[in-house]
Swiss-Prot record:
GO terms for molecular function: 23S rRNA pseudouridine(1911/1915/1917) synthase activity; RNA binding. Responsible for synthesis of pseudouridine from uracil at positions 1911, 1915 and 1917 in 23S ribosomal RNA. Belongs to the pseudouridine synthase RluA family. Its EC number is 5.4.99.23. The lineage of its organism: Bacteria, Pseudomonadati, Pseudomonadota, Gammaproteobacteria, Lysobacterales. The gene is rluD. Residues 25-97 form the S4 RNA-binding domain. Keywords: Cytoplasm, Isomerase, RNA-binding, rRNA processing. The active site is at D145. It is an enzyme of class 5 (isomerase). Its main location: cytoplasm. Disulfide bonds: none annotated. GO terms for biological process: enzyme-directed rRNA pseudouridine synthesis. It catalyses: uridine(1911/1915/1917) in 23S rRNA = pseudouridine(1911/1915/1917) in 23S rRNA. This is Ribosomal large subunit pseudouridine synthase D.
Length: 331
């Protein structure tokens, strides 16, 4: 089977021939095998919208093929964003013609929305690569909360985005976070607790038996006298998942004003620790490691985002406080 290809900023095209062995099968099923880089649902949408022709004519997804027909896929991407390009600095950890991998700082919103019409990651991406205007969501594949820092992958083409979204859906993308939580844990574990929108507060998520599956694995990275640094790995990617799960365990993330409640200061903490905890204005959560298969070629990619300065300072103050506390205890 030979597939001819053409791509430009205005769209892309593919052309191939239906093999004789496919005779009698549904067109959408055969199309999914001919173009495995796209999901079947997306291909079905293109059939219905007239972006796929069989021997130059429109057909339905359920229509049979007979073998030997010419399939022409011609897609002109919809311009799906009203966001304007803005010159906002980006910390790019890796890039090629198919993807960006970046280190998002805390405080940067991913998408424009109510209260954040501009100044977002999407605005920055459109400035960095104007062609992203032709990719849904400007190529964003997954999100991080405004005040969560760390590594994100952005697709630069529709094909790359489709492949990465499929990997997320099939749990082939691995994400590891650094989280600093309240209280000194003695061991790691797994939280398997479904999550849905809070019934009364629409800004919050909540553990609920009627929610969507959510699984978080966590292990101890560093233990302090009244706090713990955890490495958290996600099987699922629900909104606020780690924050909700840690609060559910009654070990909320340091600085999490939404799920952590009032500020909790350890007894007889050092002045430096008190100042640090009172002044830490975002959740102590950092997306540190992202592992995925490259959307073109399927080679494994592993990117590490350095721990940001504010978290490094928090960890340093926690170490100093713990050392002084345990030294006093030994006297």
């Amino acid at each position: 089977m030979l597939v001819s290809m053409s791509d430009d900023l205005a769209g892309f095209s593919r052309q191939t021939t239906v093999p004789d062995g496919a005779a009698g099968r549904r067109f959408d099923a055969v199309l999914a095998e001919l173009f495995p880089e796209f999901s079947r649902s997306r291909l079905t949408e293109w059939i219905k919208s007239g972006d796929v022709l069989l021997n130059g004519v429109l057909v339905r997804p359920r229509d049979p093929v007979y073998g030997g027909e010419v399939v022409r896929l011609q897609v002109v991407p919809d311009i799906r964003t009203d966001a304007v390009p803005q010159d906002i600095p980006l910390d790019i950890l890796y890039e090629d013609e198919h993807v960006f991998v970046l280190n998002k700082p805390a405080g940067l919103v991913v998408h424009p929305g109510a209260g954040n019409p501009d100044g977002t990651l999407v605005n920055a991406l459109l400035h960095r690569d104007p062609a992203l205007a032709a990719v849904p969501r400007a190529g964003v594949v997954h999100r991080l909360d405004k005040d969560t820092s760390g590594v994100m992958v952005v697709a630069r083409t529709l094909q790359a985005q489709t492949a990465l979204v499929e990997q997320l859906s099939s749990r082939q993308v691995h994400r590891q976070y650094l989280a600093v939580v309240v209280s000194a844990l003695v061991s790691g574990g797994t939280v398997n607790a479904a999550i849905e929108r809070h019934p009364r507060d629409r800004l919050r998520m909540a553990v609920s038996d009627t929610g969507k599956e959510a699984v978080t694995h966590y292990r101890l990275r560093e233990r302090f006298r009244a706090h713990t640094a955890l490495e958290c790995r996600l099987d699922t990617g629900r909104t606020h998942q780690i924050r909700v799960h840690m609060a559910h365990l009654r070990h909320p993330i340091v600085g999490d004003r939404l799920y952590g409640g009032s500020l909790k200061l350890p007894k007889v903490g050092t002045d430096a620790l008190v100042v640090m905890l009172r002044g830490f204005k975002r959740q102590a959560l950092h997306a540190e490691v992202l592992e995925f298969l490259h959307p073109v070629g399927a080679l494994p990619v592993r990117i590490v985002a350095p721990v940001p300065e504010d978290l490094c300072q928090l960890l340093a103050v926690l170490r100093e406080d713990s050392a002084l506390f345990f030294e006093r205890e030994r006297r």
